[in-house]
Amino acid sequence: MESMGLTAVGFVNEAAIDAAVRRVEDLFSPQVVQIQYTLENNHYGDPAITFRILVTDDAAHDIDQLYELSEKISKTLTNEAHTYEIGLDAHFSYRTVSEQKKLPDPMWK
C-alpha cells in the first residue's frame, strides 16, 4: 500500500502526482522542459495544486500554437493526476526558458 502524505491541503498521494507529472513531461517532450507543482490552498481556502510548466522558446513562438499546447498540457495533467477526483482545484502557470532566465524565481528552479 502506498503511503499518503498529509499536506496543507489534506491527504494526497504525492508519489502518484509525481508519476503523473513525469508521464506528462515525457509525453510533451521536447516542448516541455520541466513541470513542477505546489500543493496549497487557493484564495478561497480550498485545496489546490499549482502546476508550473516550463516550455521551450520555440513552443511559445506562435501564440496560437502555445494556446493549443497549453490546453493539451492542462487537460492531460488534470486527467493523469486525477486532480478533481482527489479534490484539488488545478491551476496552471506557463513560462518560457528565456523568461525564466530574465525573471529567475526559485519556485521555478
Language-model regions, residue ranges each:
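N-terminal presequence-like segments and adjacent domain-start helices
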Residues: 1-17
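Short, charged/polar micro-motifs that form catalytic or ligand-binding hotspots
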Residues: 7, 11, 41, 67
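Short, non-transmembrane amphipathic alpha-helical segments
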Residues: 13-25, 59-86
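Short acidic, gly/pro-rich beta-turn/loop elements at beta-sheet edges
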Residues: 25-29, 45-47, 61, 102
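Short edge beta-strands and adjacent turn/loop segments
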Residues: 30-55
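Residues that cap or initiate secondary-structure elements
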Residues: 43, 57-59, 98
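Polar/charged, Gly/Pro-rich intrinsically disordered segments
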Residues: 85-109
